């Protein structure tokens, strides 16, 4: 008779430590079916904290009511992670009171329903999804494939076209390096734009060192590319066009469908970095002729450390993998997948599709209120196209105020002056430079990010706080004093000393 793994472990332990096997047997807990108390809280899909209400207290009460209806207690809901939704008012951290969070382009808070989905994969369902000889592997592999289907459904793709990665940076590198390397004997030219994310720009520059030529398209003062310039840049040896769908600093939405049509007509692969667009704007890879698309989980209220790349199968896109190994993910991305992250990513994608209309209406309403309030102050400018912009990303320049000074003055609000990936640099935004903004305006820009869990009272507070502190900082500025006196600063010949 075959012994179970647990029984064999008990026998070995009793022999090594000379302790009766019955002692270990009495303490044995079936790990496979163990579930911690917090993991047992199941939040109803309809729990949408700020989608249907603007007051966090009311939203918490709504969550508690739903938990009570499902047989749990309000305390259990709080323990399961609903306190994460009151992120603006948490105390007892190493940095004092938690500020209001309006930096959604950097990352989004994990939805409690996503966390709830992930927990069981840290306890009972811990099998390797690539182990196909026993139920531990079958269980997690089923969950992985279900998640893959949810990720694909959001963009009308085939699940087999979704390759899981560690995030959008890896996905972008796979494309910018993998496609040109595969076609390097006949195709030596890449086209991208000057306002792409740093990982795309750096990957393109890396390919220049390998002998490829890269054309960086300009954008107009609204942040949009010129389609005629794109067509003129295409050469017989062009292998790839990469254009970001939604810009991470100014939220501008590029004409993806038109770009896809141009690329398909010229038989060139079209890649779009959709880290800021996936689940937030309508994307159909077939309708838009997209061949490759990068996705990030933590931008859609999912876990960090997981992302995906869409790779078209018909017509088939070929690329060299960055990683060598066991040939997982159809040979394009070797390495053992993390089922908790993949499952969380899939649940986040499912919720984004399910709540798409409600989320968009909520974010648009708060964005309109924020923009109206911020632009009511004099000498403020909305950066990027007002007509082709994702509402959840608002980038405003406050003339005669240093952006870093304003950020420090707004310590009770979590904001940024540009991409989180380059926030350590004090250089003005290269994206705003590409729009033709001078150093002064580029330095004075602040990015506001609105998301699913943002509230109307937070927006009201932010508008008032920003207006008050901009006024205070301007009163300290000699340049502002000169402007108030009617002096044209552009007419002054500044000394170089």
From Swiss-Prot:
In alphabetical order, the GO MF annotations are: cysteine desulfurase activity; iron-sulfur cluster binding; metal ion binding; pyridoxal phosphate binding
State the top-level EC class.
transferase
Indicate the impact reported for residue 191 to S: Disrupts iron-sulfur (Fe-S) cluster assembly and decreases cytosolic tRNA thiolation. Exhibits constitutive up-regulation of the genes of the cellular iron uptake system
Q: Where does pyridoxal 5'-phosphate bind?
A: 168-169, 248, 276, 296-298, 336
The pH dependence is: Optimum pH is 8.5.
Q: Which GO terms describe its biological process?
A: [2Fe-2S] cluster assembly; intracellular iron ion homeostasis; iron-sulfur cluster assembly; mitochondrial tRNA thio-modification; tRNA thio-modification; tRNA wobble uridine modification
SUPFAM superfamilies (alphabetical): PLP-dependent transferases
Q: May I have one GO cellular component term?
A: cytosol
Q: Where does [2Fe-2S] cluster bind?
A: 421
Which residues are the active-site ones?
421 (cysteine persulfide intermediate)
Q: Per the annotation, which location comes first and is thus the protein's main one?
A: mitochondrion
List localization entries. Mitochondrion
| PROSITE patterns (UniProt xref) | AA_TRANSFER_CLASS_5 (PS00595)
Q: Where is the transit peptide?
A: 1-33
Required co-factor? pyridoxal 5'-phosphate
Name the UniProt key words of this record, in alphabetical order.
Iron, Iron-sulfur, Metal-binding, Mitochondrion, Pyridoxal phosphate, Transferase, Transit peptide, tRNA processing
Q: What else is known?
A: Present with 504 molecules/cell in log phase SD medium.
Q: Belongs to which family? A: Belongs to the class-V pyridoxal-phosphate-dependent aminotransferase family. NifS/IscS subfamily.
Q: Which NCBIfam families match?
A: IscS (TIGR02006), PRK02948.1 (NF002806), PRK14012.1 (NF010611)
Role: Catalyzes the removal of elemental sulfur from cysteine to produce alanine. It supplies the inorganic sulfur for iron-sulfur (Fe-S) clusters. Plays a role in both tRNA-processing and mitochondrial metabolism. Involved in the 2-thio-modification of both 5-carboxymethylaminomethyl-2-thiouridine in mitochondrial tRNAs and 5-methoxycarbonylmethyl-2-thiouridine (mcm5s2U) in cytoplasmic tRNAs.
Free-text domain note: the N-terminal beta-strand formed by residues 99-104 is essential for the function.
What is the name attached to this protein's record?
Answer: Cysteine desulfurase, mitochondrial
What organism does the record attribute this protein to? Answer: Saccharomyces cerevisiae (strain ATCC 204508 / S288c)
Q: Which gene encodes it?
A: NFS1
